[in-house]
């Protein structure tokens, strides 16, 4: 199932890296677990802070990529500045959930989409994915 970002991308400032689908995925997790994360900040600074709080729970998004689909099929309403951009990826929920947690994320959850489907990954493959993610974040 596809996920639709809940916000527009955060604009890079002062040499920061650009906002990615993975960042959108982490922010979506913050919105689902909103009782665990909060921020007094506004706008883009809020998005960045919430994303960073989710990262402290060892949550991560891997292999995020857009899909070619009818975008309006996945979101009922978005702000004019938010592109309806369906995407898929592998998410690790870290300490946010157990192996039995059922969760849907993103704008698409309002229409019955965004459901996370379990996908087993070997420990070795998972560790490689973590290393690759760390390496790409260092750039």
Residue ranges and their predicted role:
Residues 1-139:
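RNA-interacting cores
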